[in-house]
Regions:
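Preference for intrinsically disordered or flexible, low-complexity segments
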Residues: 3-268
Length: 268
């Protein structure tokens, strides 16, 4: 990364006088401001969920983990590999979102069974795996209630509120977005310190994906349109699950078809 060097030249690291060090900090600040001027054109609002532990119940409330809303006794998705019910990872009541309100529930189910190891057997880290169920359903009555065939149900955390926060694209997306600058290390550290200019790593609604490896948007299987982030799940944030080695998962949605959902994750 040579963004600062191009702008301001190389720095002598030996015996830097105080005045020169002050100028160096000024140069970093100028580079930071110049970077933010460009990145602000791509700023989105993400929403951080406020959660509280809840006794698991079949309901149509927004939640992470726990028990889902079921339309009937056969509505809980079953993994084709182990024949057990999949864990509910997240359920969003779309009428209660802070923005882009719609009817229905968005649900993400994921098989966490380790014997057999369905995650690897079914390549659940890739979108559209058979051991993952992403769907939008309507709620027309009270939820059905069943005893799931699942090893250990995850704790239910109700989403009780949303905190808006500025969110910015990952540097891996700069080329695709036409952002023409190289993110200098000193500027990146300043962004981290001020918590601005970077994608949020934690659980969030909307915003920009935090890519652990590279840009991995799925595409609508009919229209081939790039899908958009609906919800991001970080390892062991609200969900008691680790995606590989501290990975991050993304529930995405097609802009062409709201029922086209996908989920994938990557780790370090």
């Amino acid at each position: 990364m040579n963004y600062l060097k191009k702008l301001f030249g190389s720095k002598n690291q030996e015996n830097i006088p105080m005045e020169q060090e002050r100028h160096s900090q000024e140069e970093i600040e100028k580079a930071f401001n110049k970077s933010m001027d460009k990145l602000n054109n791509f700023k989105r609002i993400a929403y951080i969920p406020t959660t509280e532990s809840n006794q698991a119940s079949f309901s149509g409330k927004s939640k992470i983990g726990g028990l889902p809303y079921l339309r009937n006794d056969n509505d809980w998705p079953i993994c084709p590999n182990c024949k057990k019910n999949m864990q509910l990872f997240v359920q969003l009541n779309l009428t209660e979102l802070p923005t882009n309100k719609e009817n229905g529930l968005a649900q993400l189910f994921y098989c966490t069974n380790s014997e057999p190891h369905c995650e690897s057997d079914m390549e659940a880290f890739f979108p559209f795996s058979k051991s993952v169920e992403c769907r939008i359903i309507e709620t027309n009555s009270e939820s059905a209630q069943i005893e799931p065939n699942i090893n250990e149900l995850f704790e239910e955390k109700l989403i009780t509120g949303w905190t808006p926060k500025d969110d910015f694209p990952h540097f891996e997306e700069y080329d695709q977005l036409g952002i023409e600058f190289e993110l200098e290390d000193d500027v990146y550290e300043l962004m981290e310190e001020r918590e601005i200019g970077l994608p949020i790593e934690q659980d969030k609604l909307f915003g920009w994906p935090y890519w652990v490896q590279s840009v991995e948007y799925p595409f609508d299987r009919k229209t081939e349109t790039q899908m958009q982030l609906l919800f991001q799940l970080a390892s062991e944030d609200n969900l008691p699950y680790m995606f590989g080695d501290a990975g991050i998962g993304h529930l995405t949605q097609s802009p062409d078809n709201r029922e086209e959902l996908g989920f994938g994750w990557a780790c370090y």
